């Protein structure tokens, strides 16, 4: 973060001009730092790290359960729509859902266009209750996809917030270096991979590096997390 404002530096002059012209700046670089496939994943792949784990917890994509009641004739269509929208993922499994059969009852009033039954009469319908899990980031699109696939004019559905752990968004990565070797050799390889003329480093260059932590940007405040994660070298 910004710790001083000096006009004799490049960044200081930039801030001075922004303030003088009443310009607000919103920088979303942290989004790329913590996104799956973002800056840190790109760096980790470039360095050849494997067995990757996140370093700094940032947020969690909370989980919801959606339960929808649908006539048996359209159960498969609604299940497919939910899956296509991103619902139903549990670990490395997709298209996860549960179905229970039952009887739905309703009475349509004037001005409605019921898919089943007549206006003014209580109708019984053979229905399925379809349940599946969906992350908050895909909740809106999942509900919309379900509504499009559902034949009813007014589908009945429930949304339940869950206490299950959702997908974590993490800044930084910790991974296994391809071959255990002295830190100085690792630094030389990193310098070449990143096409740098020089690297600044501190610490014992003879230590054998097996795990490497990295965090794009200024990550000096997370050195302890890197050490606790088992890294012998921290790149930031």
Set out the residue ranges of the language-model regions:
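Hydrophobic structural segments
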Residues: 1-236
């Amino acid at each position: 973060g910004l710790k001083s404002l000096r006009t004799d530096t490049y960044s200081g002059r930039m801030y001075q001009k922004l303030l003088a012209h009443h310009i607000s700046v919103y920088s979303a670089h942290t989004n790329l730092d913590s996104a799956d496939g973002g800056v840190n994943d790109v760096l980790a792949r470039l360095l050849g790290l494997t067995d990757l784990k996140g370093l700094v917890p940032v947020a969690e994509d909370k989980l919801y359960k959606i339960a929808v009641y649908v006539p048996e004739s359209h159960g498969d269509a609604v299940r497919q729509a939910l899956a296509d929208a991103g619902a139903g993922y549990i670990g490395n499994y997709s298209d996860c859902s549960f179905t229970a059969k039952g009887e739905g009852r309703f009475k349509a009033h004037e001005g409605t266009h019921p898919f089943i039954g007549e206006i003014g009469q209580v109708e019984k319908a053979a229905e399925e209750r379809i349940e599946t899990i969906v992350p908050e980031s895909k909740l809106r699109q999942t509900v919309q996809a379900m509504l499009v696939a559902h034949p009813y004019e007014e589908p009945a559905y429930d949304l339940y917030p869950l206490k299950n752990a959702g997908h974590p968004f993490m800044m930084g990565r910790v991974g296994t270096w391809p071959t255990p070797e002295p830190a100085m050799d690792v630094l030389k390889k990193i310098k070449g991979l990143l096409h740098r003329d020089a690297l600044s480093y501190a610490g014992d260059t003879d230590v054998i590096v097996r795990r490497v932590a990295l965090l794009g940007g200024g990550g000096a405040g997370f050195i302890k997390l890197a050490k606790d994660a088992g890294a012998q070298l921290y790149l930031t």
